[in-house]
Swiss-Prot record:
Pfam families: SpoU_methylase, TSNR_N. Signal peptide: none annotated. S-adenosyl-L-methionine binds at R135, R165, G218, I238, L247. This is 23S rRNA (adenosine(1067)-2'-O)-methyltransferase. Keywords: Antibiotic resistance, Methyltransferase, S-adenosyl-L-methionine, Transferase. It catalyses: adenosine(1067) in 23S rRNA + S-adenosyl-L-methionine = 2'-O-methyladenosine(1067) in 23S rRNA + S-adenosyl-L-homocysteine + H(+). GO terms for molecular function: 23S rRNA (adenosine(1067)-2'-O)-methyltransferase activity; RNA binding. GO terms for biological process: response to antibiotic.
């Protein structure tokens, strides 16, 4: 294990960078704090540009993460216990974390260049659900995700990074208005299908559709908006126990993506 430099002085410029990035009142987000081993590792693999990665001098720095940083030329240092206590006064101290530049937002053009299905989440605001869908998409091969009325101002939201385990940077995620999304899918040559409790197609029939689909999901309470239901060529339902009120949206998306995995995983990613 390499001997890592330890930051012991509160006046080190890195300390102020860390303090600045943890402020909740920032109006313009250009940098983000990414914490924990898996989100850091996935972000590094996705090509996110890091200023520096840090650990605590009281905890061994993970060897695999150090190797990933060295491969990318990312500097790694440790915080002394005293400095860490000053920086994270009101927050739980992460054992490993990094300061990264926020990547550019995803664009509809990024989706056009890919071949897999697209997931559209309409009015889904629970970040944990969005993060779970991002992880499932990474495993099952859809091209990307469009978020409409999600309440998120950036894909670099720390809650989303944590919930997605860092996979949020591994695929195009487009933050769009409803009108922007409708215009793209009208002109983009993809077939929108909306998921509803009384959908006409069963989930099993998705496996036989050899076209690029837009899989449209709404919130559990209200479902997709009428605008998206109006442009969808088909509606799909997932059979379940009549005594159950609904499925969690991340579970529904996972079931749908599993049904589409044969097609999506067989297509080139680029």
């Amino acid at each position: 294990m390499a001997n890592l430099d330890v930051i012991v002085d509160r006046s080190d410029p890195a300390v102020q960078r860390i303090v600045d990035v943890t402020k909740h009142s920032r109006s313009v987000v250009r940098t983000v704090l990414i914490e924990d081993i898996e989100p850091l590792t996935q972000s590094i693999r996705a090509g996110v540009e890091f200023t520096e990665v840090y650990g605590l001098d009281t905890v061994p720095f993970p060897g695999d993460l150090l190797a990933a940083c060295e491969k990318r030329g990312i500097r790694v240092r440790l915080l002394s216990a005293a400095v860490a206590n000053q920086v994270f006064k009101t927050e739980k101290k992460p054992k490993v974390f990094g300061i990264a530049k926020v990547p550019p937002a995803g664009r509809f053009a990024d989706l056009e260049s890919l071949s897999g299905d697209v997931v559209l989440l309409d009015g889904v605001k629970i970040v944990g659900n969005i993060g779970a869908i991002v992880r499932t998409r990474s495993a099952l091969g859809a091209a990307g995700i469009v978020l409409v009325d999600s309440g998120l101002g950036t894909i670099a939201d720390r809650r989303l990074i944590r919930a997605s385990r860092g996979y949020v940077f591994s695929l195009p995620i487009v933050l769009a208005t409803r009108d922007e999304a409708l215009a793209f899918f009208r002109d983009g040559g993809m077939r929108p299908v909306v998921f509803e409790a009384d959908g006409k197609l069963s989930i099993g029939e998705l496996d036989g559709i050899d076209e690029r689909l837009v899989l449209v999901f709404g919130s559990e309470k209200t479902g997709p908006s009428g605008e998206f239901a109006g442009v969808a060529t088909e509606s799909v339902s997932i059979p379940m126990n009549p005594a159950a009120e609904s499925l969690n949206v991340s579970v529904s998306a996972g079931i749908a993506l599993h049904r589409r995995a044969r097609r999506n995983l067989s297509r080139p990613r680029g």
